[in-house]
Regions:
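Low-complexity, Gly/Pro
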Residues: 1-2, 173
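Substrate-binding cleft and catalytic face of glycoside hydrolase catalytic domains
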Residues: 7-8, 42, 46-60, 69-188
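Short, acidic/polar
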Residues: 26-43, 70, 115-126, 191-203, ...
Length: 264
């Protein structure tokens, strides 16, 4: 018997508290080697598509969706009794949505047309996987500090900086049973944590359903992520709803951190 088969898996050791997840790269229409596929199936409670659900990959041409890689991952999760995370409806960074989103023939699309496309995209994606994806990263990486407090993108330029409110309300209407996440990075930085908490609180005060704050944790030794998680829990409807969406920890003082981190 191989050593790894004699040891308990990560998901067995965690016992669901917390759920252990990983990202999966599937946009080329296949998973990994049999050994890697077995690790994905046995070690993790949840899987998240790394890129294939992002708008620019999923629908590079208007009306032409590439659902096959996403279907592959969702089917994989279903077979292995894993949760699947929807990542992401809107990534607030230029280059993370298709160019056609802002074009109307030979001219720039107005806000009305862009909103219609956003709503159509959310409906097509969330409706297709309703009941199979129970948690959606609705908005990814909106906050920027200092001023103006948000990352300026083509989306904020065309739709306005208040577009997240309408986006969350659209998502809640399409799939009322899904958990909705506001995802951001560097929550261990006090200035960013303060801005993220204020942003989430303001949206919830406006009637937005936000069940989870997701932390993309690109950490170095000494980052105080524990206090960041406690801070996030102050604004959530129930305790414990800060989820780590990404996690890597580096020690910049160790020259060999990259190969050793990779090996780990």
């Amino acid at each position: 018997m191989a050593l790894e088969s004699a040891l308990p898996s990560l998901r067995e050791l965690a016992g669901g508290k917390p759920l252990i997840g990983t990202s999966v790269q599937t946009q080329f229409g296949k998973l990994y080697t049999p050994e890697e596929t077995n690790l994905l199936a046995t070690q993790f409670d949840s899987v998240t598509p790394e890129n294939c659900m992002k708008w620019q990959y999923l629908c590079p041409k208007e009306g032409v969706y590439r659902f096959e890689p996403v279907d592959l991952l969702i089917d994989f999760a279903t077979r292995n009794r894993q949760k699947a995370v929807g990542h992401t409806l809107i990534f607030n960074r230029d280059g993370n949505y298709p160019d056609w989103l802002f074009r109307d023939g030979g001219k720039e699309a107005d806000a009305k047309l862009v909103w219609q496309r956003v709503e159509d995209h959310a409906a097509k994606l969330m409706s297709r996987y309703a009941g199979r994806i129970d948690s959606w990263d609705v908005l990814n990486e909106f906050i920027e500090v200092p001023s103006p407090g948000y990352r300026v993108t083509d989306l904020t330029r065309v739709l306005g900086a208040d577009y997240p409110e309408r986006l969350f309300k659209i998502a809640a209407r399409i799939d009322p049973k899904a958990k909705l996440t506001c995802n951001d990075f560097a929550v261990e930085r006090p200035d960013r944590l303060k801005a993220i908490l204020a942003f989430v609180r303001s949206l919830r005060d406006k009637g937005c359903k936000i069940d989870v704050v997701g932390s993309q944790s690109h950490l170095e030794i000494g980052d105080n992520a524990v206090y960041a998680a406690l801070g996030i829990n102050r604004v959530m409807p129930r305790p414990g709803l800060c989820r780590v969406r990404k996690l890597e920890a580096a020690n910049p003082g160790v020259w060999h951190s990259i190969p050793y981190s990779h090996a780990a």
